[in-house]
């Protein structure tokens, strides 16, 4: 039986943070400081996803660093007419597939499955990838996200939520989504960094490693689409393949 490479070894590895905040919203580092900090820690890619504002930081790009253009939109139950004991909220990271095609899309203004699903559709129609963020932190469960339509990825791990509130893991929610939503959902680990105390406060704790032939906007988006990446909070995956019906994973110590 032919060997099936799940992470092509001939490709380069590009470490990425797909959820990041700067001084353009509620973060404490400038985009330039974010780039400096993440490059120093071995990252090649950062998606700049400030709250409800789309800003192109491609001026930060160099041969070893790529800024993805995106934003995080949030719809709170408290603000939009649905009262709960806890303030439920839906946060979505939307990342442009083509930074030259930047069409602003704003958050849903009703906290309903129908409104949020329509907003995800609008993002897709305007050339965005959509990741559903930190459901555990958001106090959301299957009753909510099963009505959100076809988001592309879900944060299985959010480092900022884990550091601040011990609720950054969303294993159960991800398992339910895979079983019940009838489409492939990418598994994302991300920082959601705000750097409120120092650079290390909520940075470099959860990441994605893309496998791509080179570092460019197009190749990283293609790697996302093709699921040619893995998410981690520590171990490095060196090989991942299926051979003779056996799944083989070679990684650094866990």
Task: Label every model-predicted segment.
Residues 1-9, 13, 182-186, 193-254:
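C-terminal functional module detector
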Residues 155-161, 179-182, 228:
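Short, well-ordered alpha-helical segments in soluble proteins
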Residues 2-129, 133, 140-142, 147-149, ...:
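A metal-dependent hydrolase metal-coordination microenvironment
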Residues 172-179, 216:
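Functionally critical loop-and-helix segments that line ligand-binding/catalytic clefts
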Residues 39-44, 180-183, 225:
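Sec-exported extracytoplasmic/periplasmic mature domains
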Residues 128, 152, 222-225:
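Active-site-proximal helix/loop capping residues that flank conserved catalytic or ligand/cofactor
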């Amino acid at each position: 039986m032919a060997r099936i490479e799940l992470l092509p070894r001939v490709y380069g590895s590009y470490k990425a943070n797909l959820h990041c905040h700067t001084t353009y919203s509620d973060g404490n580092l400038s985009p330039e400081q974010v780039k400096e900090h993440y490059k120093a820690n071995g990252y090649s890619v950062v998606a700049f996803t400030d709250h409800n504002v789309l800003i192109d930081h491609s001026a930060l790009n160099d041969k070893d660093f790529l800024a993805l253009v995106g934003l995080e939109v949030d719809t709170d139950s408290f603000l939009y007419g649905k009262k709960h004991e806890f303030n439920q909220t839906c946060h979505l990271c939307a990342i442009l597939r083509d930074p030259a095609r930047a069409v602003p899309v704003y958050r849903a203004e009703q906290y309903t499955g129908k409104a949020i699903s329509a907003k995800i559709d609008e993002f897709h129609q305007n050339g965005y990838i959509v990741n559903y963020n930190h459901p555990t932190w958001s106090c959301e469960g299957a009753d909510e996200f099963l009505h959100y339509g076809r988001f592309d990825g879900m944060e299985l791990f959010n480092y900022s939520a884990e550091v601040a509130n011990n609720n950054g893991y969303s294993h159960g929610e991800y398992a339910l989504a895979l079983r019940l939503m009838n489409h492939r959902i990418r598994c994302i680990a991300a920082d959601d960094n705000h750097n409120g105390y120092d650079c290390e406060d909520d940075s470099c704790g959860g990441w994605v490693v893309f496998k791509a032939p080179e570092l460019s906007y197009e190749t990283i988006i293609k790697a996302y689409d093709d699921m040619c990446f893995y998410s981690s909070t520590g171990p490095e995956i060196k090989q991942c393949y299926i051979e003779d019906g056996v799944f083989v994973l070679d990684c650094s110590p866990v």
